[in-house]
Curated annotation (Swiss-Prot):
Any Gene Ontology CC annotation: extracellular space
Functional description taken from the UniProt entry: Parathyroid hormone elevates calcium level by dissolving the salts in bone and preventing their renal excretion. Acts by binding to its receptor, PTH1R, activating G protein-coupled receptor signaling. Stimulates [1-14C]-2-deoxy-D-glucose (2DG) transport and glycogen synthesis in osteoblastic cells.
Chain residue ranges for the region called Important for receptor binding: 51-69
This protein's name: Parathyroid hormone
GO biological process, one term: intracellular calcium ion homeostasis
Biological source species: Rattus norvegicus (Rat)
Positions annotated as propeptide: 26-31
Complex formation: Interacts with PTH1R (via N-terminal extracellular domain).
Length: 115
């Protein structure tokens, strides 16, 4: 066990070291990146990893369908290109010329201008 005089010498030495360094309890060097920025970067990284895993899973599913030779049916309501050139015709159902408007369109414009 330490004697009282040895303990006093150690305490005086520690006090001298603390006073001479003048750190005041603050870190000696400032950090280049704050903890908040590190946590933000970690969150972005985890989201990116999660997206990559999801994409890998989806691509693996597509690869499995292709390797098994499964024919995928077209979904109803999805866009499909016309198979024949004749089907790709513009519809002339709108007889309005440019600048012409319906009564409802004019009413909306008048109300918008008055405000």
């Amino acid at each position: 066990m330490m004697s009282a005089s040895t303990m006093a010498k150690v305490m005086i030495l520690m006090l001298a070291v603390c006073l001479l360094t003048q750190a005041d309890g603050k870190p000696v060097k400032k950090r280049a990146v704050s903890e908040i920025q590190l946590m933000h970067n970690l969150g972005k990284h985890l989201a990116s990893v999660e997206r990559m895993q999801w994409l890998r899973k989806k691509l693996q599913d597509v690869h499995n369908f292709v390797s098994l030779g499964v024919q995928m049916a077209a979904r109803e309501g999805s866009y499909q290109r016309p198979t024949k050139k004749e089907e790709n015709v513009l519809v002339d159902g709108n007889s309005k010329s440019l600048g012409e408007g319906d009564k409802a369109d004019v009413d909306v414009l008048v109300k918008a201008k008055s405000q």
